[in-house]
Amino acid sequence: MEEKKKQTEPEACKVAKKCGGCQYQGVPYKEQLKKKQKMVNALLSKYGKVEPIIGMENPYYYRNKVHAVFDRDRKGNIVSGTYEAKTHRVVPVENCLIEDKKSQEIIRTIRGLLKSFKIKTYDEDTGYGLFRHVLIRRGFKSGEIMVVLVLGSPILPSSNNFVKALRKEHPEITTVVLNINDRKTSMILGEREKVLYGKGFIRDELCGCTFRISPKSFYQVNPVQTEILYQKAIEFAHLTGKESVIDAYCGIGTIGLIASGHAKEVVGVEFNKDAVKDAILNAKENQIRNVRFFQGDAGEFMEAMAAEGNSMDVLFMDPPRAGSDEKFMASAVKMGPEKIVYISCNPETLARDLKYLTKKGYQVKKIQPVEMFAFTEHVETVCLLSKKCLA
């Protein structure tokens, strides 16, 4: 059985050392999970029992969001891939072991089309050239595919023919968006967009809800494990249908909308205005009427709610890797929800934030690591905190 398993696993990635994206390439998967468990235990076990990490059945080709940067090699050939770790040198990538296979096929096709259409790649040093990046998002359950072409100018020569040629090779593509990034910046996407084909977004299904995903929207990259993560978060909240819930850092409304069927009301807050637009549309599309979404800084929003004397029963918080800030957590403590469900992609900042919350009257009840990023050193963790009972 072990011999058969070894035969079906892909060969180790040939560019892993240069790319730097997968710190655990070459490490057996069970060993990766042990390393992550050990890391979470070391940081969080002082707050309570850390449950065994929930691993993946198949840790390959799981990323439904794929980004490629385009350049030319020394011979003038068009290459696509990723930036070498801590540099802006492009590492050509033919087959990434964690990125969606279909998306990688589309990127290879685009590389050929650039040559056929004589489109020049962008040169970061000189600022000349046109074609910078490609971003592809694929709906795991819907099968819908969005291709975002990132250019240094608003005009793609022969854009209609380019899109036709691309869709001839890949008729499964449901929308193509032109994103204009004409600044000297390390940011991938610019502010302006133009839809070349389709609706300009895709839809996907998660935990029974349908979600609209735009080029700039945050949506978890591992769809199978995301369902497990969110189901665990809802389970930890132990909602009865009577609770008022806040979904902080709500993105396109995923957690809030999934929780809405188990709660009295949900309020979501998110800084990214594009994500908030999607969240509002997602609520309408799912015919959910007990959810409201607001655009703004989560800390300031919570502060204002606390100042007005508003209270909530449950707080879901899913901050970025930097964790939450003290302003947000101080206002959260002031509002005093009975339960806080904290979803974290960085156990170090989670440990820091738990230290603050446990000093302010909360007790960690459950800690569950979830594998979301196989072959990398990253790990997601969901924690349940409850108000301490005063004797």
Task: Name what the model sees in each region.
Residues 7, 23-121, 136, 141, ...:
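Extended interfacial segments that mediate partner engagement and assembly in macromolecular machines
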